[in-house]
Every structure is written in structure tokens, then in C-alpha cells.
Amino acid sequence: MPKNFASDCPGESTLFLRKYQMSVQEKRSSSHLYYIPPWHLDRKYGSCSTILLDNSTASQPDLRHTLESVALAIYYNIKHRYANRSLAIFEEPVHPLPQEKLPGKSFKHDPKRNCIFRHFCTLFQVIKLTAPCAIVALVYIKRLLTSANIDLCPTNWKKIVLGTMLLASKVWRNHGLWSVDDSQNSKDTAVENMSKMEKCFLELLEFNIHVSASVYAKYYFDLCALANDHDLYFLFSFLHKDKAQKLEAMSRLCEYKDLHQDAAALKRVISMNFIGIGCSNAILS
């Protein structure tokens, strides 16, 4: 049985949010003041009945906004790592992603936020991934770091991100594990190396690839909080009639499904209550 990770507890804070809070604490201690982001000072709040909505939900997140948020999460995981612990199979200098080895100086410094974001954009464009895959991949990264007792470093973050993204894509689409057709990276990554990395990932995760809805929601809202603190906002628009009708239709569909699921469950319970009860013959006196 795969073990339960502490990060899977809905009440437990996510790793990247704790790392970000470390940066906030550093800014506070260095300035000896309570750190308030500058964009919070001029933010305006409305008290009218106008409803503004964005095009992102937990089930269908906005792709660009999600990638920017996940890039921030990876950035803080690397910046506030405990050490440079890693495994050889994840080390890019040992098993490089491109066919040609990168110069060693590429791994001496922590990657910048825009560098991580550009890498994500390229990765999602080539492999055709969806926004939820990035959120699920963050869950896998936390499990991997905890189980293998390693850190996200300049030398291994690209391979770990690639592996978790591919695994999340397979699980999200409910397909078999990595294949050459889905990875679409034969010119950049050796198939043999990907197979070894696949096996290593699953063993380190102890085949615990299930992500509950509560854990997914926790990561989604923590990413929203992280993005909000970095002035990464969604593009809001007024709630118009067509959008309201669409939301109402989606809500009714969910209620309809829940109602029928409850009715089916009630039928099963009632039928189970009568299992084993035979027809008894009436005794007339």
C-alpha cells in the first residue's frame, strides 16, 4: 500500500507557499518593517452589486495564469532549498535533456522566474499539456522531494518537471504511462533514458499517483494566493446574461448528476437491506 504523504492533507500548507513565506520573512527582517507589497496599497475594493468574473475555475484553469503561478512555485522551491541533494538519473549534467551537453556554467546559478516560465511555455506547446496537469505535477513534485529526500536544484529541476508533467498528463487523461507518441520528445530525450526515469519516478512515488479533489483544490487556491501576492491577476469581465445562463446550466447539470447519484445510492442501500431476507410462510391459527 502506498503511504500517505503529509502534503496530501487538505489542511496542510503547500511546500511552495511555505517557501514563499520564507522570502517574505527575509524581506521583513532585512527592512525591520512589516512587509506590505506595494500593489496592496493602491488596490481598490467595490461594495456595489456589480459582479466581475474571470475565465478560470478550478476544473478549467486559465493556462497562462497557471503556468506563471507554477513557475513562481518552482522558483521558490529552488531558491529556498535545504541543500543540493539529488539523484543521478535526474541530474541534467549526467543525463542531459538535449542531445548535446550544456556547459557546466548553466547550472551554477538558480534559474530566474522568466526562464522557468519560458521553459514551461515551450514544454506545454510541444507536448500539448493542459493547465490541470501543471497543478497535479506540483503535487507529484512535493511527493517526490519528500519520498526521495532530495531538493529542486539548478541541475535537476528541468528533468523533474518534465517527468511529473508527463505523468500528470497520463493520469489526467486516464491513459497508460509514458509512451513515445505522447512524449513527442525523441529528438531531445533518449527513449531509454525516459523509460528509466519513468520507472524511477513510480518507484519513488510508491505508485501513489492518485490526487484527491481536496488536494487539487488546495494547490489551486494556494497558487491563486501566490499569484495574487505577485500582482498576477486574471482579466476580469462583467457578468453578462449569456455567461450567467451558461453558469446556471452548468450548476443545474451538477445538481442533476448529484441527485441521480444520491437516488442510485439510496436504491443500493434499500436493496442491500433486503439481501438475505427470504419469504417466510404465513402461519394461520
From Swiss-Prot:
Disulfide bonds: none annotated. One of its GO terms (biological process) is regulation of canonical Wnt signaling pathway. Residues 111-209 form the Cyclin N-terminal domain. InterPro entries: Cyclin-like_sf (IPR036915), Cyclin_N (IPR006671). It holds the Pfam family Cyclin_N. CDD domains: CYCLIN_CCNY_like. GO terms for cellular component: plasma membrane. Signal peptide: none annotated. It comes from the Eukaryota. Belongs to the cyclin family. Cyclin Y subfamily. This is Cyclin-Y-like protein 1B.
